[in-house]
Every structure is written in C-alpha cells, then in structure tokens.
C-alpha cells in the first residue's frame, strides 16, 4: 500500500516465481554498462551535466554505479569521431564565413590557462550553413588565426568571398596572408557597442539615432555624409567615436557593395553569436576543463 497525501493506493506487485523476468536496462548477470546507458551518459554530457551529476543520475535512475573514469572512458569514444569531423573535406568556395572565438579555462602542465576556441561557420554558394570547424588553441592571435585559415585551405577551400568577424585580434593580417582576395566585414553591432560604451545615459538615445543614419544609409556615400554629420555634432563631447568608425571604415563598409538581402546577412555576426550562446549554455557548469580534448568533446557533442 502506498500512502501519498491524497489517500492510500493499493499496488499489486507481480511475482516472478519462475525467474523469467528480464530487466530492460540491466540484463541478468550483466556486469558491464549497456549501450543504452552509454548513450544516456553521452546525452547528459552533451547537455553540460557535470561528471558527479551524471554519476548520481545513473545511480538513482538505473541503480548502476559509474565512476569518473568510466564517464571519461565513455565520452572519450567521441574524440576520434570529432577529430574525423574536424578534418573532413570542405567545399572549394564559400560565399560567407563567420569567424569568432570564445574563451575557456583549461588545465595545462599543472596550471589553469585561458584558451580560445576558434569557430568558423560557412555559407556555401547554395545558401547552406555549416560549422566548418572548432579549434582549441592559444589565446587570440594572428598566428593562431593563420593556423585556422590554413587548416580550412588544406581541407579544400580555395576562396571565401566575405569573412564576417567582430574585429578579431590579428584576423585581418592572417586572412590577407591565406585568402588575399577575401573581403572582411566587421560586425556593426560590436562597433555600436564600442561607440556607446562611454556615452552618458541622457545622450545615448540621440547618439544611437545618429549612428543609425550611418549603418542604415542607402549607400556608402550617404553613410560617409552621415558620419561627417555625427562627427560635427558629437566630436567635442565624445571625441573618440567618429575616429573609431573612420579607422575601421574599410572593414565596416563592405556590406554597402551588396543588395539588401546580403547586407542583412553579413552586417552582424548573429549567425555565429547564436551558435556561441548554445555552446556557452552547455559549458557553463564547467569552470575549468582538465584537458583540451575534454573541452573539444563537450563542444562537439553540444553541436550535435
């Protein structure tokens, strides 16, 4: 008899007098973990659950004890698959490639170091979007961006029409060396954030309205006229804003060469920012990863 708060319930407990009952999760006399439980462990790992949470969940639901080593052994099976994916051949030409880096803490030689995960998402000539790769490397630098771009080239990419970034450290130098014909479009939203960073609250609405006349202009000539007007109005109060736009103009204005449909696609890095949010959501429970491989396998599972 079960006695919940709403009243007693009579439960009939079946008896297996002949010993014919066969459990579905753990078979009789089974000492190893079933494929089903391994898949559950991979699924939980992909959702960002910690090893201890996975152990508790498996014990509570399935009555099976698993250790840290077991969880690592099971999730390590993903590594060859992830590395094969990372080396797969790519299309020869991509219309747009979005590139970004997100940062994590990883143990290395007894110390906790900050590492960057370099990410590339491509849109091919048929409009299909695909994650081209994720690379765990040193903190953002031109040298490592060159490594990433050369990896893409070695996997078959011959040309990228437009590379969209948020003004990444060292990126312009690296892409000019590997794909010299590629045009760069820096993210307008990031430029707006930088422009508004030190603006007083009472001025922000008016300033953002003036900035919109620049990035929403019908063409580059009109945008430059709007930039001149903004400079005249705000240069004394906020002397760094207009020069910042002028300094980065060649990489901020690329989208004016294209029709509106293409402009909407490339003037921000929303396509990769959404993917980054997905990764951060899964990895937020991990403050430090024990190895580069442990980080890579979680990111790969999160992507799948």
What are the residue ranges of the model-derived segments?
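Conserved beta-strand -> loop -> alpha-helix junction used to position metal-binding or nucleic-acid-contacting
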Residues: 162-169, 174-212
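Structured, non-catalytic alpha/beta "coupling" segments that mediate domain-domain communication
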Residues: 1-13
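DNA-recognition alpha helix
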Residues: 52-63, 301
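Short, amphipathic alpha-helical "recognition" segments used to contact nucleic acids or chromatin
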Residues: 36-48
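Acidic/histidine-rich catalytic cores and adjacent linkers
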Residues: 213-304
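RNase H-like nuclease fold core
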Residues: 12-17, 24-30, 64-65, 73-165, ...
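Short, basic interhelical loop/turn and adjoining N-cap
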Residues: 59-70, 237
């Amino acid at each position: 008899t079960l006695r919940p708060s709403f009243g007693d319930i009579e439960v009939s407990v079946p008896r297996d007098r002949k010993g014919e009952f066969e459990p579905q999760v753990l078979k009789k006399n089974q000492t190893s973990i079933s494929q089903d439980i391994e898949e559950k462990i991979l699924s939980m790992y992909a959702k960002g659950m910690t090893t201890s949470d996975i152990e508790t969940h498996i014990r509570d639901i399935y009555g099976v004890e698993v250790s840290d080593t077991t969880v690592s052994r099971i999730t390590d099976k993903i590594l060859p698959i992830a590395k094969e994916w990372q080396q797969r051949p790519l299309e020869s030409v991509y219309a747009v490639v979005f590139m970004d880096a997100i940062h994590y803490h990883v143990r290395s030689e007894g110390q906790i170091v900050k590492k960057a995960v370099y990410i590339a998402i491509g849109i091919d000539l048929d409009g299909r979007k695909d994650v081209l790769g994720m690379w765990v490397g040193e903190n953002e630098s031109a040298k490592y961006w060159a490594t990433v771009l050369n990896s893409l080239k070695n996997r078959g990419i011959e040309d990228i029409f437009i590379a969209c970034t948020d003004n990444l450290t060292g990126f312009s130098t690296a892409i000019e060396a590997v794909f010299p014909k590629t045009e760069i479009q820096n993210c307008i939203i990031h430029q707006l954030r930088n422009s508004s960073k030190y603006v007083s609250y009472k001025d922000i609405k008016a300033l953002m309205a003036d900035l919109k006349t620049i990035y929403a202009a019908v063409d580059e000539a009109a945008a430059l006229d709007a930039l001149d007007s903004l400079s005249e109005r705000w240069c004394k109060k906020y002397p760094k804003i207009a020069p910042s736009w002028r300094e980065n103009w060649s990489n901020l204005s690329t989208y004016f060469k294209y029709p509106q449909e293409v402009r909407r696609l490339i003037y921000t890095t929303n396509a990769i920012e959404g993917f980054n949010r997905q990764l951060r959501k899964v990895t937020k429970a991990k403050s430090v990863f024990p190895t580069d491989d442990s980080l890579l396998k979680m990111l790969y599972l999160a992507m799948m």
